[in-house]
Amino acid sequence: MSDEGRPHDQAPAQASKASRVTEQIGVRKGLFGVRGSGDTSGYGRLVRPVLLPGSTPRPFGGYFDDVADGLGAALAESGVGFEVAIESVVVFRGEVTFGVRREFLPLVARVLRDEPDLRFEMCLGVNGVHFPQDAGRELHAVYPLLSITHNRRIRLEVAAPDADPHIPSLYEVYPTNDWHERETYDFFGIVFDGHPSLTRIEMPDDWPGHPQRKDYPLGGIPVEYKGAEIAPPDERRGYN
């Protein structure tokens, strides 16, 4: 089936640099964060801000405005304002991400799934992200959604603090998120409230900590080869 004749469903081109807003959450020093090595390249003194793309002003372009309008209208019918449930809309590199306040995540997901003009029938899982510099919002959960009916893709992003790492589970809306939420809990420590069986899925039950967090200590064991031995990662130069 051809998509010709459906220009309104095409994703927009890259937003101009003038229209982008960024949020600085930290500063990175040195090349790739290397520490404790003899640097002769000069890059060891590199100082670079850590930036997150901020909210994008209207118009978003392509079908992104249609999705935002449809979501806003459906939320209003539920008695919730768009700005109350959605804290940001970011268009970056031809993709759109709706930042959702965590208490409204199940409602937003259900509306996106059930509203005929939206019909995002498929959630492709959940990805955890850890931003230690993003104070009060260190843990992020990202949900890629696909509308098979309308041939559209969007993302939902929810943030939670380290001190209260709870996000509502989407198991009731998208049951296939079952194992994805368990994996994100396993590796990042995000607690998905309402999940029917939130247990570790890859690491042993008694494993300390959550290994994909950026503050997780690097460790390992030496690996022996014929005539040589490779030191464990925590005994090598540090990169972060």
Curated annotation (Swiss-Prot):
GO terms for molecular function: NADH dehydrogenase (ubiquinone) activity; NADH:ubiquinone reductase (non-electrogenic) activity; quinone binding. InterPro entries: NADH_DH_suC (IPR010218), NADH_quin_OxRdtase_su_C/D-like (IPR037232), NADH_UbQ_OxRdtase_30kDa_su (IPR001268). Residues 1-21 are annotated as: Disordered. NDH-1 shuttles electrons from NADH, via FMN and iron-sulfur (Fe-S) centers, to quinones in the respiratory chain. The immediate electron acceptor for the enzyme in this species is believed to be a menaquinone. Couples the redox reaction to proton translocation (for every two electrons transferred, four hydrogen ions are translocated across the cytoplasmic membrane), and thus conserves the redox energy in a proton gradient. Belongs to the complex I 30 kDa subunit family. Its main location: membrane. It is a peripheral membrane protein. It is found in: Cell membrane. It comes from Rhodococcus jostii (strain RHA1). The keyword Membrane applies. This is NADH-quinone oxidoreductase subunit C. It catalyses: a quinone + NADH + 5 H(+)(in) = a quinol + NAD(+) + 4 H(+)(out). Its EC number is 7.1.1.-. Keywords: Cell membrane, Membrane, NAD, Quinone, Translocase, Transport.
